[in-house]
Amino acid sequence: MQEISFEIVELEAQTYHPLVRAEFPGLEHCWWVIDSGASKSVFDVSLTSHYVLDENDAVMATGLGKEVVETRSGTIAELKIGDFNFGPLRIALVDFGHINSEYAKFSNKKIVGLIGCDFLYSHSAILDFRHKRIELKK
């Protein structure tokens, strides 16, 4: 079991978002939102050097919150969260411009992705809000 600390950002009165730090070559101080309400993990499409598009990728329109956004699919070869590396992760790719605009109002954190239930389920995640940590099986 891997234990990883997370931070909680309050984006308006009583709307809390747990964030874990991510590392990618050439990117400092980037964060993933732990989003157990998201069925699939999502990554910022603008970070092209950090993923490979699926060969049979098709542009799809998907509801993300109230908005309809273009979605593509791809794979991140390596995902480093905290001090731990997790193998390849299939991801949906969307433009995170609007997400980072909202976060900029309340925080200086750059969001690069949402960790969804696909990842949380496959790693038997346990979120401990009291101690601000997530436990993951590798």
What is each stretch, according to the model?
Residues M1-K138:
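Pepsin/retropepsin-fold aspartyl endopeptidases
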